[in-house]
């Protein structure tokens, strides 16, 4: 069925006003206790009131690494869609779209219509969201190339599209950025001709001035800052240096070790702007997280989940969920863009290796039948730099699992990932969903004071390889669980129950739900002794496309 564009929930629990959507929602879950070796499961229920502001702001996005492949590609994508561009290719004419974006190209099911068919709507229609074509971009880069030149250097887009975008992008020039050579590979020094001078404290203040200038000059209501620059080496968490907000701010003032990405995170938080980390390093050290908590500013990370790791988070979930014991995961990549060149240095590769390797942890821990405590699959990650392949990353994976009675199963997968074309829609979703979360507040029957989501915005886990979560919160990596989390929270905001995929209406011998349509019965089917009527629920008796001579007779009690 073709996706509709808008809907209204007709329920006494949902109230629409010009300013807000207010929904009463019953959150049902379970708590588990252990008593004498027996697990006691206790169903619980909490009454939530969600309130979502309907007024969509004028939103600006500042990209750290704006002139890189990801930044130039995202900017080009929004411009191409805004201008409704099309261009010729060897396989025919292509038109601008937002394929790869959960919010712009995904759909959700609202339920069944009168004929028992599912009704789907665009994901973006669940709640009022900023239109991506309306986004305003700015940012920083250690390279001084304008965005048109950066787009050409990236070699991601077809030439015909580049030619049309050139006059719209050549006036866009990144602001100077922070360059600390020891945090990125030495091979990046050739690009570093556009840097902020001075001490760490002076650099922090310059970033803050840049954010304020962008907000004022572009007439923006909100700004979100997103790190899409080089992968940095890990920063050691040291008591007295970066373990608390106070210590981190003092470290910056004293000019001690702090990474460029952490400087941008601190500046964003101090300016009240959400900060999202799209690279694998530990940008959000404990001091930065504490500062975000103190200022009630959203932060999220780490590392865009775009290609090989997204497939891994599905495939391992499938294998373990099917009862197969995955024992070996070997992942090999080669790519030729600047990300690959930077990752050719061991300290930067180590950051990426950590984020890629942790993606299966929650799936392994979810099955104590297969894995004993502390047991993990062997997991090897290799990344090589091959300049010729450019942004077209090759990913090869081998998954080996144990079967029953000593058997083994091996899956080998080759995946060609257009790196920036996969990352750009993720960056778009991060900005749109983060802004939406800023307009949602809620209270509960036991805590009537309005509150927002936790500053560590774990709802964004679907979009990150190594998702951050609040202290003590479980980390979820399984892709479909992550997507369901986003969808069901947005459904709750309009008073809809979570999507459970049960479809009980279609699994009953005698449907008790009244429907209108050609397959509906005119009167309820009565339960009597003896054989049940043939196909009382409208079943045709067809199985896998093959008609049956006679529908099965179901016994009754």
Swiss-Prot record:
Q: What class of enzyme is it?
A: isomerase
Q: Which Gene3D superfamilies match?
A: NAD(P)-binding Rossmann-like Domain
Would I find Isomerase among this entry's keywords? yes
Which cofactors, if any, are listed as required? NAD(+)
According to its UniProt record, in which pathway does this protein act?
Polyol metabolism; myo-inositol biosynthesis; myo-inositol from D-glucose 6-phosphate: step 1/2
User: Which SUPFAM superfamilies does the protein's record reference?
Assistant: Glyceraldehyde-3-phosphate dehydrogenase-like, C-terminal domain (SSF55347), NAD(P)-binding Rossmann-fold domains (SSF51735)
Q: Which domain of life is it from?
A: Eukaryota
Phosphoserine: modified positions: 279, 357, 523
Q: Spell out the subcellular localization from the entry.
A: Cytoplasm
Alphabetical GO biological process terms = inositol biosynthetic process; phospholipid biosynthetic process
Stored InterPro entries: Myo-inos-1-P_Synthase (IPR002587), Myo-inos-1-P_Synthase_GAPDH (IPR013021), NAD(P)-bd_dom_sf (IPR036291)
E.C. number, please?
A: 5.5.1.4
Q: Which Pfam families match?
A: Inos-1-P_synth, NAD_binding_5
Molecular function GO labels:
inositol-3-phosphate synthase activity
Reaction(s) catalysed by this chain's protein: D-glucose 6-phosphate = 1D-myo-inositol 3-phosphate
GO CC terms in record = cytoplasm
In Swiss-Prot or TrEMBL terms, this protein is called Inositol-3-phosphate synthase 1
Q: Which organism is it from?
A: Bos taurus (Bovine)
What gene is this protein translated from?
Answer: ISYNA1
